[in-house]
Each structure stands twice: as C-alpha cells, then as structure tokens.
C-alpha cells in the first residue's frame, strides 16, 4: 500500500509540473523546457497510469487554459492529445487493443509523421474562412483568426463547399527559416518560434514571420477514411504532408517508422515521431475517446538519449501525502536539446540499489520520465571516502516523526507538517480542481506564512480576513492584483461535483475516480449522506465477524461502481472517519454551490440506469459495450443487486443470470441490448 501511495504522490507532483509547463508553453510561449522534455513528462504520466489502479489515476489536460489576452473559441469537438508509445511493444499493444475492442482480425492503419508544431483549428462556412483557434485546453482555445489569415498559402475561400467545414492541422516554421529568424537567439527552437509568432496581438508581426502549416483532419465532410480526408484536403488547396502510408499489420507500421526515422534530418521541419490512425472513420467513431485522447490513434515517439554529468547533491522533497522523495541535483547537461538539471531517485531502496552518492559521475537517460532517470553510476571515478546517502530520520520540513511503509518513508504529522498542508492547499486550487487563477503554490505559501490561509475553507474567507490586514503594503500586491485575486476566488464558488471531489486530495482519488463517484451519486448531498450512512453502520456493530461483515458493506457499494477498487473504498472510509475532514466539508458547503451531475443523455431510456454485463458478447467487445452504455447516460456496475436496472446477458452468462432472475432484475439478451442502443442512435 505504501508503494502505491508513493506512486500516487509522484503522479500528483507530475500532474502539477505538467500544468505549470502548460501555461508557459501554451499561453506565454516562454517554455522553461524543450518540447521533447515536455513529451517525456507526459510519457511518464502514461507509464504511471499503467502501474496504478484505474480509479487512482488523474486525467491530465491536453493543453493549458486559453491566454487571457485573446478572445475564446469553444471547440465543437475537443482537440485531444494523443496516446504515446516509445517502443515497438507499445505499438503492438495499441494494435492488439483496438483489434480486441472492435473484434476485428485486421485493421487498416494510416501512418504519417508527427509534426512538432502548434495545433490549430480553422472553420469554414459555405466555403468562407470565418475563424481559427489554437488548441488551448482542448475544449476552449484562443481566437487567432486574423493571425492564421496572414499565413502565406492558407486558403481564405474553398470552392464548391457548403455548410460548415472544420480543418485541423499543425503550424510550424521550417528549420532554415528559423535560423534566419533567430539570429538574436530569441527562441529556443522552431516550435517555440511558431507559437510565439502565431499568438501575437499585433497581427503584422505574425504576417512577417515565415509560418507554414500542414492540415491533417477534416470535420464535416463526407469522407469515409483518413486517407480520403488527406486527399480531399489536398484537392481543396491545403498543404498536406507527402510522407504517408497505409498498412494493415504491425510490420508495415514499424517499417514506416524506420523509414521516416532514418530520413528525418533531411527534412526542413522538425518531427518527433509517427502518428498511427485507424483509417476507417466509422471504426474511429466506434472506438471513441478517453478524457484526453482518441482510442483510434497513437504517437510513436522517437527513442531515448543519454548523457553523463555530475551529481552535486541529493535533497528531499515532502509531498502532500507526507512521502519523502529524494531528488538528485545535477550539473546541468544538454541531452538531445534539453537542459537537464534534476533526476528523480524515487525512494530509499532505489538509492541503495543503484548505490548513488553525492559527487558521483552518473549517466542520465531521458525517455519519458517525470524527471530524467539515473541509469548508471561511474563508480570508478568515485572518491574512496565518498559517504553513502543517509535518509533522514525526521521530516526535513516539520521535524516530525517519519515511518517506513514499504519502500516509502512518510511523515506522520498530517495536520501540522507545513509541506503537507501547503501541498493539500495547492492541490485544492490546481488545474482540474478549483483552478483559481492567480492562486498557485507561491501565493499559497505567502498567505500561509502570514496566517491568512491555514486550511482549505480559509481560501473563501480571505476577503474578510484581509479587512484586518493591509495586503497592498506587501511586495507585488496592489489594489488591482488584490481585486483580481478576490474576483477569481468569487468566480469559483460554483463547482461541479467531480471537480469538488477531486479537489479534496483524498488519497488514491484522481480525476477519473472523482468523475466515477460523481456520476454514480449524482449530487453532493447523496454522496456525502451515503458515506456517512455507511460509516454509521460501523458504529452500531460489535466485534469479530459481525464487524467485518458490516465493514464490507462500505466496500461493496463502492467497489460495485465500474472502475472503483478496494483502495479507493478504504481511502474514502478513512477520510470520512476523521472529524477534521467532516468539519472541513461542512465549512466548505457554507461557501460553495456544488452542482449535481447533469446528464447529456436525459432523453435516453438508459439515462441513470445501472447496468451489469455478463457472458460473452458477439456483436461488440465488453469494452465497447461499456463505452456505448455510458455515452447514453447509463452507469455500469460489476456487482449484481436489487438496485440494478438491467443485466445484459451474452453467451454463457453464469451465476449472475440466475441471481438476476431471483432478484427480479430486468434481463436483456444481446439482440435486445443491440436494438436498444441503436434505436437511441437513430432517434
């Protein structure tokens, strides 16, 4: 359990780190790390998701909130990111997964280079170019219509096009043009130059920059495949990439990768991998998407690089759950265009296993890690008297007792450790939670040290507290900045249930689990009262077997929710068992309006129905069946009880079928299920 908690702590840090770089990258065009390093951060997130229980993982965003300087445009269809793979096994898993999902033995795959540029969306109405937007956070982007219109060769009018057509692609700058543009070293690389050039309030600056683009997607057309989409885009006058291929097997996918990989330096633009897409658009639609990426596409990123440097010092970070994480401070070294100065050492056992010591010469690998990894220690260059690293016996932040939990070392002072309190407060206001603009970790520390924000409810009482404190006398604070912050807090007094649950920072509950809980319980009162009711059962029991039976009832209800596991159930029970958490919830509800879940499928006969699947389905995989059910507003459970509305029974349904008959649960065979969901679509 301790190892899992440690991983979730690291996962949370990574999410916050990515959010920080999202703002620098998407809003300010002033990244502190190169694109390749950012991709590696995202890759680590994917790797950790694979190691964590599904309900624990956090759904990270696909960009950053739109820059306040620009008007906003809401995307009709989200501009999602892509799942990444870094080896052939990852590509093979992708192909196997989509075949299994679709129950198809052979699937045609479209292959194309992944352009290292800035994503855009352009909308045409009756052939006339009317607006363009950046990706933004994937749902809302910046309005860059006038800027895109200045790009040489970008179509302003499309012949013989009616109704609405949306074109998506990537804006970039050629390497040769970048060298001419960047004589004063204003930009780190061509991608940053493209982003900075496009997002100019003065469009004359954009017009004078050598921006180019490739189009790769079309929404609103009648094409049936990705290859047809590219051909149509080309016929309409858009620039499309010449390097593309169709294949129906793994060897063909890898052959295209190797071909492009070997010629990539002869191209006059940067690419950072290959994109694979299911060619058939109907199959793409069936596959659907997760919160952050389409299931029908994969980016196979180029491989890792290595470098040697010196490890200066090992220091300890304390996270919001109290885990002590060792981090290596390195002499900065350039690895494939990325300046690396830190490496994650994970835990005490990792340091002992690798025998890492301060002053060592180490080999760093950069390949999708949260912070690049130390893969080798040059012990031959080590001083004979170099001491081994000694893990602290007390918390370096608060001086409290630490205790070993598996490989993790944890500070036990949850309520008094400053690092943990700051971590929880910072998580509460972070992206994905309350997302309060202008109130990040730096400001949280500032207000904490002043005694103005000591616990979460204090955030919403800050204005009243400032009546007795002259904040404008503090450095960097004036009337305008104070007003902006208070307005930002005021604007976050209404929040959806899933974001509220996530904001609480309950161990093992990321955005995925929070959304599952919100969809199941629908309203805050129902969720809160259900948790309290389940806990009250424990208070009424005696000891021994009876206690175990009642305790299991708490787990039974939660584990029955599709995607929720035992760890989440245990964590919720622990959270609601603590009086200070109950008080915090009551205080927060005095300040907040927590919105109930509003289904987009309110007219569906499956809306808010609870469904259990059993047996083998022939017309679709179990995974696709669950996706289709949830899309129509249903809740999917794995446990059968009298509360279940329908049992969908495939071949060889087993004991669940008999139990459903006994309980009087409605039973649908596969044909009835198939007709039900398809009648919903046709309507």
Curated annotation (Swiss-Prot):
Pfam families found in the cross-reference section: BRCT (PF00533), DNA_ligase_aden (PF01653), DNA_ligase_OB (PF03120), Nlig-Ia (PF22745)
Keywords: DNA damage, DNA repair, DNA replication, Ligase, Magnesium, Manganese, Metal-binding, NAD, Zinc
Matching InterPro entries: BRCT_dom, BRCT_dom_sf, DNA_ligase, DNA_ligase_AS, DNA_ligase_CS, DNAligase_adenylation, DNAligase_N, NA-bd_OB-fold
Enzyme Commission number, as recorded: 6.5.1.2
Active site location: 114 (n6-amp-lysine intermediate)
Cofactor(s), names only, from the UniProt record: Mg(2+); Mn(2+)
Residues annotated as binding NAD(+): 35-39, 81-82, 112, 135, 170, 277, 301
Enzyme class, first EC level, given as a word: ligase
GO molecular function, one term: metal ion binding
Name of this protein: DNA ligase
Provenance organism: Wolbachia sp. subsp. Brugia malayi (strain TRS)
Gene encoding the protein: ligA
């Amino acid at each position: 359990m301790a190892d899992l908690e440690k991983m979730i702590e690291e996962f949370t840090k990574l999410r916050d780190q990515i959010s920080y770089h999202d703002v620098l990258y998407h809003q300010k065009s002033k990244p502190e790390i190169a694109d390749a390093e950012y991709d590696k951060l995202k890759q680590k997130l994917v790797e950790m998701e694979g190691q964590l229980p599904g309900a624990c993982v956090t759904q990270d965003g696909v960009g950053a909130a739109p820059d306040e300087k620009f008007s906003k445009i809401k995307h009709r269809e989200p501009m999602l990111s892509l799942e990444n793979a870094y080896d052939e096994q990852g590509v093979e898993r992708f192909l196997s997964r989509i075949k299994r999902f679709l129950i198809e033995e052979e699937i045609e795959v479209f292959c194309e280079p992944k352009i290292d540029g800035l994503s855009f969306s352009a909308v045409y109405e009756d052939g006339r170019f009317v607006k363009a937007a950046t990706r933004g956070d994937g749902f809302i982007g910046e309005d860059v219509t006038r800027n895109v219109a200045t790009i040489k060769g970008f179509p302003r009018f499309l012949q013989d096009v009616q109704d609405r057509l949306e074109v998506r692609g990537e804006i970039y700058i050629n390497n040769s043009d970048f060298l001419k543009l960047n004589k004063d070293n204003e930009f780190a690389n061509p991608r940053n130059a493209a982003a900075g050039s496009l997002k100019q309030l003065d469009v004359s600056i954009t017009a004078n920059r050598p921006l180019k683009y490739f189009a790769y997607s079309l929404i609103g057309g009648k094409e049936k495949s990705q290859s047809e989409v590219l051909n149509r885009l080309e016929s309409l006058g858009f620039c499309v990439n010449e390097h593309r291929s169709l294949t129906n097997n793994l060897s063909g996918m890898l052959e295209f990768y190797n071909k492009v990989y070997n010629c990539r330096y002869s191209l006059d633009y940067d690419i950072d991998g290959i994109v694979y897409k299911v060619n058939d658009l109907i199959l793409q639609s069936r596959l659907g998407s997760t919160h952050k990426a389409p299931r029908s596409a994969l980016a196979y990123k180029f491989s890792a690089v290595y470098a040697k440097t010196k490890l200066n010092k090992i220091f300890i970070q304390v996270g919001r759950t109290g885990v002590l994480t060792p981090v290596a401070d390195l002499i900065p070294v350039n690895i494939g265009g990325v300046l690396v100065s830190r490496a994650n050492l994970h835990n005490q056992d990792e340091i002992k296993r690798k025998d890492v010591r301060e002053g060592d010469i180490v080999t760093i690998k950069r390949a999708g890690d949260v912070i690049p990894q130390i893969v080798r220690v040059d012990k031959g260059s080590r001083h004979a008297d170099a001491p081994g690293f000694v893990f602290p016996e007390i918390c370096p932040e608060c001086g409290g007792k630490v205790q070993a939990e598996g490989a993790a070392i944890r500070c036990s002072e949850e309520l008094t450790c400053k690092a943990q309190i700051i971590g929880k407060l910072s998580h509460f206001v972070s992206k994905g939670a309350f997302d309060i603009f202008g109130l990040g970790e730096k400001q949280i520390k500032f207000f904490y040290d002043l005694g103005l924000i000591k616990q979460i409810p204090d955030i919403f009482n800050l204005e009243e507290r400032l009546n007795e404190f002259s904040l404008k006398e503090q450095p960097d604070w004036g009337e305008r900045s104070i007003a902006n912050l208070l307005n930002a807090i005021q604007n976050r007094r209404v929040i959806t249930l899933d974001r509220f649950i996530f904001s609480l920072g309950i161990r093992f509950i990321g955005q995925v689990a929070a959304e599952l809980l919100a969809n199941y319980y629908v309203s805050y009162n129902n969720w809160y009262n259900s948790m309290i009711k389940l806990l009250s059962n424990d208070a009424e029991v005696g000891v021994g077997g009876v206690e175990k039976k009642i305790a299991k009832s708490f787990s039974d209800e939660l584990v029955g929710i599709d995607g929720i596991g035992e760890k989440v159930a245990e964590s919720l029970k622990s959270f609601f068992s603590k009086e200070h958490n109950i008080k915090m919830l009551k205080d927060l509800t005095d300040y907040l309006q927590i919105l109930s879940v509003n289904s987009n499928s309110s007219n569906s006969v499956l809306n808010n129905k609870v469904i259990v699947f059993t047996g083998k389905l022939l017309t679709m995989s179990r995974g696709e069946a669950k996706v289709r059910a949830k899309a129509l507003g249903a809740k999917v459970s794995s446990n059968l009880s009298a509360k279940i509305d329908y049992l969908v029974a495939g071949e060889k349904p087993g004991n669940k079928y008999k139990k459903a008959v006994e309980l009087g649960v409605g039973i649908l065979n596969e044909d009835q299920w198939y007709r039900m969901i398809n009648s919903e679509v046709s309507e």
